[in-house]
Amino acid sequence: MRFQDTKDFRKSLTKLPAHVQLQIIAVLENIEQATSFADIAHMKSLKGHRSYYRIRVNAYRMGLYWDGENFLIESIDTRGDFYKTYPPK
């Protein structure tokens, strides 16, 4: 599956510890190799938001938007702060 990331996501990623960055890179590779949603580990849809998903990476959550063809990776934050700002209102 194809994906794009936002400038905010890349900026947040650079602020994370190195071991978490490596795990997130592995998740991004998993998304590229996936042929269906079921192939992407730890991905769940957000309740009440049809096109928004999250992926768990230890204590962090990645926010994704599915436009029908591609994923847009919009956000990454700690679990506690992630749900305060994602999905965008």
What positions do the PLM features span?
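Conserved short hydrophobic interaction patches
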Residues: V27-N30, R79
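Enriched for short, Lys/Arg-rich terminal
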Residues: I40, V57-R61, Y65-K89
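Arg/Lys-rich, positively charged N-terminal/basic patches that mediate binding to nucleic acids
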Residues: M1-V27
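A short, surface-exposed loop/turn module that caps and links secondary-structure elements
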Residues: E29-R54
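Residues that recognize and position ribonucleotide moieties
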Residues: R2-F3, Y53-I55
